[in-house]
Structure formats: structure tokens, C-alpha cells
Regions:
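Soluble extramembrane regions of membrane proteins in the secretory/endomembrane system
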Residues: 23-219
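Sec-dependent N-terminal signal peptides
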Residues: 9-19
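Positively charged n-region of N-terminal signal peptides that target proteins for export
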Residues: 1-10
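Extreme N-terminus of proteins, especially the signal/transit-peptide cleavage junction
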Residues: 5, 19-24
Length: 219
């Protein structure tokens, strides 16, 4: 059986769930609430510790409406550079900056009724960011998706509602995307769990971390 270490932000302790016997150890890292500049150093420390301790995987349990683009970008960079397998478990929602963090992980799992997307950048007053900022976030999303083998058109559409496309190529087949939630002009793309699976943004569904690990054959 695997052992799950729960690592919580700004709290210096690790809660360990023991099994009678286990051969693999996994860190669980909650990403909740507003993503701010206090989060990247924490994530970097967790990854560094996991690498030094030969941890088998890190599961980022994500439930957030987003936050700062610069903070999310730092977290994304740290996850992409991780030598330990990284898994996003979207426990309800990964909106805005949460979507970027999710896409940076090697594997993405979502609960039933989950949501990912709507990642346009806004300023502190909630107004849409400048074209420069939108362009930056759009290409951050696209390049991250591409690096993980996910569809960069979908990722771009999560940031920029003005993008126009009617087809995607998945598994060498050209398919319509008219059924994607938020696809209509003037709206950002957001994907439900079923849609994220269909368009290869998510790898699977799970109702808890144990089922995520079971799906990946952790023992």
C-alpha cells in the first residue's frame, strides 16, 4: 500500500496516513483559496523535499477560483521542472490560475461535476487585463498544455474569448468543438469533467486521492 503525507501551506507538520505495509510514498499538497505570492515558495520547498526524499509522487489537490498570474507562473515552472511525478486532482474547480497549475502537472484527474478553465487575466479591481497581459497568459497556457501533450487550442481559448476556431485534431481525427462550454464568441472556454476527458485535458475521474492513486497503480 502507499503512504500519503499531507503537506499544508504555512503549517509546519506532516500528517501521515499509515498502512500495515507500503512501498510507495506520496505527498498531498492542497491548493485552495486565492493563489498569492506566498504559495510559490511553499510549492518549491515541497518539490525540493520530495526530490531529496525520493518521494514517488506529489498530488496537488486543487480547488480554487484563481489568483495572481505571476504566482501561478512560478508554480507552473516549479512543477514542470520537478523530478518527482506530479498529479493534479481537481476537487471541484480549477479556475484561472488554477487551470495553469493543473495543466503543468503530468497527470490531471477531476471529480465528477468538476470544472477547469476561464483563465483570462484580470487586475486587482477585477477588470480584464491589457492585451499584453492577456497575450502572455494565453501563450503560457498554450505552451504548458503543449509540453504536457494537451491541446493548446483549448488552453488558449480558456484565456482569450476572441479566438476563433471550429475544429480540433485529436488522435488524428478532425472534430467539431461546438459543444464545448464557453465556446461561443464572447465567452471563455470552461470544461466540465466529461468535456475535459473528451478533449484530452483530463486523464481520468476520481472522487478522492486514493482513487487517483489506484488509477495510476500506486501500491
Amino acid at each position: 500500500m502507499y503512504e500519503i503525507n499531507i503537506v499544508k501551506k504555512l503549517i509546519v507538520f506532516i500528517s501521515i496516513v499509515f498502512s500495515i505495509a507500503y512501498s510507495e510514498i506520496v505527498y498531498r499538497v492542497p491548493i485552495e483559496g486565492v493563489i498569492d505570492l506566498g504559495l510559490p515558495p511553499y510549492v518549491k520547498r515541497v518539490i525540493k523535499e520530495a526530490e531529496a526524499s525520493n518521494i514517488d509522487a506529489i498530488v496537488f489537490e486543487i480547488n480554487t477560483f484563481g489568483g495572481r498570474v505571476d504566482a501561478a507562473t512560478q508554480i507552473k515552472d516549479a512543477i514542470l521542472s520537478s523530478e518527482v511525478q506530479t498529479i493534479a486532482f481537481i476537487n471541484r474547480r480549477a479556475i484561472s490560475a488554477g487551470a495553469l497549475i493543473s495543466l503543468s502537472c503530468e497527470k490531471v484527474f477531476m471529480t465528477g461535476g468538476g470544472l477547469i478553465g476561464a483563465a483570462t487575466a484580470v487586475d486587482m479591481s477585477g477588470k480584464k487585463g491589457s492585451e499584453k497581459v492577456i497575450s502572455f497568459m494565453r501563450e503560457e497556457m498554450a505552451s504548458t498544455a503543449e509540453q504536457r501533450g494537451r491541446n493548446k487550442k483549448i488552453a488558449r481559448g480558456m484565456v482569450d474569448e476572441e479566438l476563433s476556431f471550429t475544429h480540433l485534431v485529436l488522435n488524428q481525427d478532425s472534430i467539431l468543438v461546438e459543444d464545448i462550454e464557453g465556446r461561443k464568441e464572447g465567452k471563455l472556454i470552461s470544461l466540465t469533467t466529461d468535456q475535459a476527458l473528451k478533449y484530452e485535458i483530463a486523464d481520468g475521474t476520481a472522487e478522492n486521492i486514493n482513487s487517483v492513486l489506484d488509477s495510476l497503480d500506486y501500491k
